[in-house]
Amino acid sequence: PTLRGKVCSFFSQGDGLAVAAALEDESYPIDELVYDLADLDASFRFCGEDNRWGGRLATACHKLYGNQTIPGYLENGVPPKYGFGAEQVVAGVHKNPLSKHAWVNELLGAGDIDRIIIEWRSTLRQISHAAELDWPRWTALQTIASEIVNETESPTITELPPLEYSQTKRVDHRLILRRH
């Protein structure tokens, strides 16, 4: 298999095609790509009035795949859930976690931001735990992804209270009917 094929095998659907396209573009800085990966799951929510298909990652995809549509993998040359704009939000929140609410507007809610951060961290985790390849750009992306995953906290981590005693007992879901 080619390096592109190996990278694609680490992901489901079209995300691997986009990552491979970005890595093959030698002029695409890895430190920008790591944030642009958030666009893979952004859909239309983050672009506002801008072009949903904009951005450096979409440009790399179009350069390599043209406007091909392959159901489930590419839609006009980019992954189907792609949407420009999430990279700015993710980079901003990564640099200053308290700035999350500054990004909230009539189209973009706090839940959307939490979701994209969760998806982005998941993609970075996938990259950091994937197999090593003899490709310096892939190795650099894995290194940066690992560093970011280890230094950031998931927005879903919550300290839960201890269980009540009644919650630790087995639940009996039988319905008992009485006859009169």
Q: Model-predicted segments: where are they?
A:
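Accessory beta->alpha helical hairpin/"wing" motif in late/C-terminal subdomains of nucleic-acid enzymes
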Residues: 1-31
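C-terminal accessory/interaction regions of large nucleic acid-associated machines
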Residues: 20, 25-180
